[in-house]
């Protein structure tokens, strides 16, 4: 048997199941169009793109970082790829209101009113890794050693603007971390609404040990998430934090416990560590997609309004968002479904 995993969220106890029984969402559907963002085309895309059907309408988009030889370190090419993927989702929604941009042809065919493909609008985004040993190792320091000061400034500006664009997406965003997320890798995960970590995951902001500080949002996004004292501890010491501690700190929203095989099982496994990393990556991605699907069971307009309301909490914001949802077709459908004792079918209108 492979390593065992179990999901720890807000429930005190849950069932344990072998990772081989977990769904394999990334392999069950065809990968979307391959996109390249550098003059020299790599053997594989720097980001694997998979669209999974979302409940009600649209799709859940899965982006898997794919630079195995560099542990997904962020190079200029990978950053350009990520920026285009984020912007392709952002273009489906109004930058000011977060509402879907009307596209009647998709509305007619898929029930939503946005989207740049036949799969309809993107309802949620999962950011994961195609590399078992690393979620993201931060900036590509080997590449940056050859930068001029001007090139360094340009790279940082692009990095910060891309992270800000990810942070500003109006749909639910989830990071699936099953190994190491260091420096800019953790800062990338901090830009998503939710983070799913496995018990063997390691996260850190080690920049002070390199004589600098986090420069892509870590010093303001981390304190906002886990509090000033805890964030200061992580940033100033640069220490590594396990998945379990990250869950305790509030950095992880879901913790998937991955247990190593016992001695008998290990004897049948040529590389126990590789088997554990593989099981962990699959378990984290499965739970992230499950969370995305669970969220997408709700009304798309209501979900986006709720995200906006809690992002800038105030009575004024809540009132404004409530006014946005109260007169929608989805709201009427929910009332009708309740009366008819069935699940509502939301269309994002």
From Swiss-Prot:
One of its GO terms (molecular function) is lyase activity. It comes from the Eukaryota. Its main location: mitochondrion. Keywords: Branched-chain amino acid catabolism, Lyase, Mitochondrion, Transit peptide, Virulence. Pathway: Amino-acid degradation; L-leucine degradation; (S)-3-hydroxy-3-methylglutaryl-CoA from 3-isovaleryl-CoA: step 3/3. The keyword Chaperone does not apply. It catalyses: (3S)-3-hydroxy-3-methylglutaryl-CoA = 3-methyl-(2E)-glutaconyl-CoA + H2O. Its EC number is 4.2.1.18. Belongs to the enoyl-CoA hydratase/isomerase family. Homohexamer. This is Methylglutaconyl-CoA hydratase 1, mitochondrial. It comes from Pyricularia oryzae (strain 70-15 / ATCC MYA-4617 / FGSC 8958) (Rice blast fungus). The gene is AUH1.
